[in-house]
């Protein structure tokens, strides 16, 4: 935790800055670290990280190989208590601050084994044949998973996953409220490229959330928003902003989609680009202002033209980088979100950006 003179100094920085600094955290432990460092909420919780625990992954795999909706729902019911507990941990640590929960994003094949012995063990545990499981794994493989069956596309194909996650968020919030915790759940739908994708899922989430609140006789303000990580979403932000309560620019994927190369593969040629002065900076570390930044500017202007009060922020790696934070400040975004240990850096960078902006007026 930050203490003593440094705490006083950081409080001066907070008095100056305009941007809120939130954190990317997937569990209560990381959330506590971030709060100790001065984070004012969670800007990104990646729910898929919660599924990789040994007991949970088995039930999630059971859901993946299920043939019917009822079988999938039965498997998801076993995961629901874990998800609920995880969300309760986050709400407790962030008492009074927003917690942005991104629904399932990665393609399903990432949750299945690829080694022969692991496939055989899983087939035995699931009570299916090895050939059946192999066929299932093969059917989920993709040529380009980054642009494949993931994010909101997964949720639209399997709405029962969205229903389970919505229940987990709502029930966790209700239980925390009974303990006197001030809860601010923000549900985030990933990889939206068309407003109709967002509307389809919002029309599942909102009625279910509202019915659970009514059932428990609880009143709670929650938000439903999306990540802007596909160029088309940025270019049609006015359409999406009519439906969404907030946008979070997922600058990692937005950079990949805009440049047309993946972060995982770019290392094969980026060093050559630096040597030959084609690129001066890593676009995955420092936001590309001229390209990706221009899309963010367009999206911000379009969104605010139809929804002036929409909450806008970024939650990629760039959320903890100084020049990227200055860009967000100058554009008038509401917040940046970064990893817990970068929170103090982001707070200082946000203060510096605000001071520089005032000096230039």
Predicted segments with their positions:
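Conserved alpha/beta-domain cores
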Residues: 2-361
């Amino acid at each position: 935790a930050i203490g003593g003179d440094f705490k006083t100094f950081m409080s001066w920085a907070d008095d100056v800055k305009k941007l809120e600094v939130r954190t990317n955290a997937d569990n209560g432990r990381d959330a506590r670290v971030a709060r100790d460092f001065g984070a004012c909420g969670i800007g990104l919780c990646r729910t898929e990280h919660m599924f990789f625990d040994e007991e949970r992954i088995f039930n999630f795999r059971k859901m993946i190989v299920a043939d019917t909706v009822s079988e999938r729902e039965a498997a998801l019911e076993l995961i629901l208590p874990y998800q609920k507990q995880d969300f309760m941990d986050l709400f407790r640590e962030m008492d009074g601050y927003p917690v942005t929960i991104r629904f399932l994003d990665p393609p399903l094949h990432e949750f299945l084994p690829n080694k022969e012995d692991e496939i055989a063990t899983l087939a035995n545990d699931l009570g299916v044949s090895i050939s059946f499981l192999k066929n299932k794994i093969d059917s989920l493989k993709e040529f380009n998973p980054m642009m494949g069956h993931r994010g909101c596309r997964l949720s639209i194909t399997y709405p029962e996953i969205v229903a389970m996650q919505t229940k987990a968020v709502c029930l966790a919030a209700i239980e925390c409220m009974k303990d006197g915790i001030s809860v601010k759940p923000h549900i985030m739908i990933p990889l939206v490229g068309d407003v109709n994708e967002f509307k389809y899922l919002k029309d599942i989430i909102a009625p279910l959330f509202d019915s659970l609140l009514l059932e428990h006789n609880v009143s709670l303000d929650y938000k439903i928003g999306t990540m802007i990580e596909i160029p088309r979403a940025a270019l049609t932000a006015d359409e999406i902003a009519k439906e969404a309560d907030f946008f979070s620019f997922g600058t990692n994927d937005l950079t990949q989609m805009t440049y047309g190369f993946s972060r995982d593969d770019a290392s094969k040629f980026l060093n050559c680009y630096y040597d030959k002065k084609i690129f001066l900076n890593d676009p995955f570390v420092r936001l590309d202002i001229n390209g990706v930044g221009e899309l963010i500017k367009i999206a911000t202007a379009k969104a605010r033209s139809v929804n002036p009060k929409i909450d806008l922020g970024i939650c990629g790696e760039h959320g903890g980088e100084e020049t990227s934070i200055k860009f967000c400040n100058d554009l008038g975004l509401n917040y940046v979100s970064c990893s817990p240990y970068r929170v103090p850096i982001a707070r200082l960078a946000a203060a510096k950006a605000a001071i520089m902006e005032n000096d230039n007026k």
